[in-house]
Amino acid sequence: MSEKYVVTWDMLQMQARKLAHRLLPADQWTGIIAVSRGGLVPAALLARELGIRHVDTVCISSYDHDNQREMKVLKRAEGDGEGFIVIDDLVDTGGTAKAIREMYPKAHFVTIFAKPAGRPLVDDYVVDIPQDTWIEQPWDMAVTFVPPIGGR
């Protein structure tokens, strides 16, 4: 990955609210399935905005920090996804998205961020990201003290 796109908490909340508006009316949804771990925070934000209390998870491991590796399903929500929003933070190459589509063919699959290779696999997303860009999510970063340049 040659570029980095840094996401702040404020940016993430704003993008999640945009996505929530597109998912109205809220009463059409039975619940939300968060793709762990990237979809956990966006799922919480959507659940709040849409007033949805039924939140489940599907746990798929496909990344090790910045390296993709073999996909492994650790836990899945029951059913075919009918009436559910499935959310992940991003769709990249589409590997996870393809697995989600197979597991939940009737779900409405959304992400906050989408790269070109994965865009056709989601029903909706908010932000276009170039394929060669790494997304730094706010939950992966920490605020640290930086000493003044002048030394005081």
From Swiss-Prot:
Its cofactor is: Mg(2+)
Q: Name one GO molecular function term.
A: hypoxanthine phosphoribosyltransferase activity
Q: Which domain of life is it from?
A: Bacteria
Pathway(s) it belongs to: Purine metabolism; GMP biosynthesis via salvage pathway; GMP from guanine: step 1/1; Purine metabolism; XMP biosynthesis via salvage pathway; XMP from xanthine: step 1/1
Any one GO CC term of this protein is:
plasma membrane
Q: What is its EC number?
A: 2.4.2.-, 2.4.2.22
Q: What does it catalyze?
A: GMP + diphosphate = guanine + 5-phospho-alpha-D-ribose 1-diphosphate; XMP + diphosphate = xanthine + 5-phospho-alpha-D-ribose 1-diphosphate; IMP + diphosphate = hypoxanthine + 5-phospho-alpha-D-ribose 1-diphosphate
- Binding residues for xanthine, per the UniProt record? D92, I135
Provide the residue positions that the database annotates as binding guanine: D92, I135
> Any idea which positions bind 5-phospho-alpha-D-ribose 1-diphosphate?
R37, G38, R69, D88, D89, L90, V91, D92, T93, G94, G95, T96
Q: What's one Pfam family the UniProt record gives for this protein? A: Pribosyltran
Purpose:
Purine salvage pathway enzyme that catalyzes the transfer of the ribosyl-5-phosphate group from 5-phospho-alpha-D-ribose 1-diphosphate (PRPP) to the N9 position of the 6-oxopurines guanine and xanthine to form the corresponding ribonucleotides GMP (guanosine 5'-monophosphate) and XMP (xanthosine 5'-monophosphate), with the release of PPi. To a lesser extent, also acts on hypoxanthine.
Fetch the HAMAP family from UniProt: XGPRT
State the oligomer form and interacting partners: Homotetramer.
Family in the record: Belongs to the purine/pyrimidine phosphoribosyltransferase family. XGPT subfamily.
Protein name, per record: Xanthine-guanine phosphoribosyltransferase
What species does this protein belong to?
Serratia proteamaculans (strain 568)
